[in-house]
Amino acid sequence: MARRYLFEFEKPLVELEQQIEQIRELARDSEVDVSQQLLQLETLAARRREEIFQALTPAEKIQVARHPHRPSTLDFIQMFCDDWVELHGDRRGSDDQALVGGVGRIGKRSVLLIGHQKGRDTKENVARNFGMATPGGYRKALRLMDHADRFRLPILTFIDTPGAYAGLLAEEQGQGEAIAVNLREMFRLRVPVIATVIGEGGSGGALGIGVADRLLMFEHSVYTVASPEACASILWRDAAKAPEAAAALKITGPDLLSLGVVDEVLPEPAGGNNWAPLQAGEVLREAIERHLDDLLGLKVNQLRESRYRKFRAMGRVLDPSSSETGLPA
């Protein structure tokens, strides 16, 4: 059996999977009918996998969101986008590979698609800078969004980044300014914008393409102002407290839905999107088409106003005298 990437919390499934593989080998090498036994074990494994993934902690969801085989932006584009043409460059001398974009069709609709892109292995991750976009990447995204605005193409963005690249060169090139300009200009767009957190949505790197009329996220994706490791290091000077920070940050779909940050949490197959990527693609396509149907019926002033009000209404204010802080002691 080919070895697969395994989480610590998946270890209880290993023995079952080994038994299933042994029975499959027996069926291949003999004429013994083991279909009933195989069905029982596969059903049991599926049920246990579902139970495990329904009970994930925020820290465990982060692991799933970072799975190396989780479908990426280009994976989803290949699943449900026709006539995809990638567009390159920010017209200022940069073509950041950590952020990709282009035009294509979903059904009969022409759309612009932009998203962070990670790699599958070390070599590709280095080329893609681990999905951490530079100022050139965000300026490329803005150039493409201006193109979509000019030609009235709906914009779809896919968020999957630990954060914007924080290297010295990125700061010298104006990382903060590039993201800030994107935030400002995305509020002014005259076309529908749908953003989806497909993996991890970290800090300003996620926000740089995240101002949208609809913000969706997958069930085991995370969306956070800072990584739990960074938060723990800042608050407690101890990165080992990352699990506590993950719980306090409210980074999961249900928490963000209740806070009004996201509009819909998309279900994932038991085991996560890496377990059944085509199924995940079908779920995402259906959601995108459904929300586009709603948004394309709005006038420009309605789009802009609802986008503005959506962000103004996010979150809630806690009473300073209240003990409800969300932070562990």
UniProtKB/Swiss-Prot annotation:
Gene Ontology MF terms in the entry: acetyl-CoA carboxylase activity; ATP binding; carboxyl- or carbamoyltransferase activity
Keywords: ATP-binding, Cytoplasm, Fatty acid biosynthesis, Fatty acid metabolism, Lipid biosynthesis, Lipid metabolism, Nucleotide-binding, Transferase
Pfam (any one): ACCA
Protein EC: 2.1.3.15
InterPro entries per record: Acetyl_CoA_COase_a_su (IPR001095), ClpP/crotonase-like_dom_sf (IPR029045), COA_CT_C (IPR011763)
Gene3D superfamilies in the record: 2-enoyl-CoA Hydratase, Chain A, domain 1
Reactions that this protein is recorded to catalyse: N(6)-carboxybiotinyl-L-lysyl-[protein] + acetyl-CoA = N(6)-biotinyl-L-lysyl-[protein] + malonyl-CoA
Pathway(s) per entry: Lipid metabolism; malonyl-CoA biosynthesis; malonyl-CoA from acetyl-CoA: step 1/1
CoA carboxyltransferase C-terminal domain: residues covered: 40-294
GO cellular component, one term: acetyl-CoA carboxylase complex
SUPFAM superfamilies: ClpP/crotonase
GO BP: fatty acid biosynthetic process; malonyl-CoA biosynthetic process
PROSITE patterns for this protein: COA_CT_CTER
Subcellular location: Cytoplasm
Subunit structure and binding partners: Acetyl-CoA carboxylase is a heterohexamer composed of biotin carboxyl carrier protein (AccB), biotin carboxylase (AccC) and two subunits each of ACCase subunit alpha (AccA) and ACCase subunit beta (AccD).
Function: Component of the acetyl coenzyme A carboxylase (ACC) complex. First, biotin carboxylase catalyzes the carboxylation of biotin on its carrier protein (BCCP) and then the CO(2) group is transferred by the carboxyltransferase to acetyl-CoA to form malonyl-CoA.
Family statement drawn from the similarity comment of this UniProt entry: Belongs to the AccA family.
Protein name: Acetyl-coenzyme A carboxylase carboxyl transferase subunit alpha
